[in-house]
Amino acid sequence: MKERLQQLQQEALEKIEQANDLKALNDVRVAYLGKKGPITEVLRGMGALSPEERPIMGALVNDVREAIQQALEAKQATLEQAEVEKKLAAEAIDVTLPGRPIRRGNHHPLTRVIEEIEDLFIGMGYTIAEGPEVEQDYYNFEALNLPKGHPARDMQDSFYITEEILLRTHTSPVQARTMEKHQGRGPVKIICPGKVYRRDNDDATHSHQFTQIEGLVVDENIRMSDLKGTLREFARKMFGEDRDIRFRPSFFPFTEPSVEVDVSCFNCGGHGCNVCKGTGWIEILGAGMVHPNVLEMAGFDSKKYTGFAFGMGPERIAMLKYGIDDIRHFYQNDLRFLQQFNRV
């Protein structure tokens, strides 16, 4: 039996040395030290030995098994190191090659315009107010002087979720909610940026989802001249210092009087071109003095407080500012379009 053990040890050490990968090495481990291996068979046969021979052979078996185990561990370490070196050689980085620049992202053109508008009005003392996009019918319509059955509701096809809940059609509900929180005490001076939703068919100038920024000022002795001065300052900061604005009479249920606001064409200086369609003016937003009914419903005394409101679409501002002819470009995630603004 002693000769058999010495022979097994010699065979195992030779096969361990010949193993050229970890799988072959594991096969040797299983073949000699596994439950069905020859070392285990020798241990099972020790029952036939005399009591005097048993401890001698047991010590010999342990020595053989220990020698094989140590050889396996040493070979495994060698093979693992070889694999690491092979992998490093295959993945080696040539530090003499020029580096690859990291592709830099940039702000979406709409984000640029929205942040620019926000910064302009924050600089004039406004704060940013926000509200829910899933809105109550009351705040979206009734609190803005649009009671149920009002014909002006037909002007805005809406996405209703229930009879009293809808996706807001403008950011004006934020104005109503903010005035309500003030509990009839001024001043209020906010802008309300956010997404709005209308049941429009998507085309070059319409989208079922778009953004709005509305502004509201409520205090004592607020006049139309304050509105005009504010919007003139906005137009000059946004489109150039030599810009002017004009008011045209219009109608909005929540303001009285109401106006459409045009800015003198920044492309031709007011002489007439294809951008302004030969008029010298470009429509940019709607505005007006807050209707007394809106003030009263929000808890303000309309005899003491007055205010003005205005609303604009950042998409339209961006289209005018950057010469974009289709609103859908903003929402199609086309990198060929978006990457043009990395240099803006």
UniProtKB/Swiss-Prot annotation:
Cofactor note: Binds 2 magnesium ions per tetramer.
One GO biological process term: phenylalanyl-tRNA aminoacylation
GO molecular-function term, one example from the UniProt record: phenylalanine-tRNA ligase activity
A Pfam family annotated for this UniProt entry: tRNA-synt_2d
Annotated positions binding Mg(2+): E256
One cellular component (GO) term of this entry: cytoplasm
Keywords in alphabetical order: Aminoacyl-tRNA synthetase, ATP-binding, Cytoplasm, Ligase, Magnesium, Metal-binding, Nucleotide-binding, Protein biosynthesis
Keyword Aminoacyl-tRNA synthetase: yes
Coiled coil: none
HAMAP family membership: Phe_tRNA_synth_alpha1
Protein name in UniProt: Phenylalanine--tRNA ligase alpha subunit
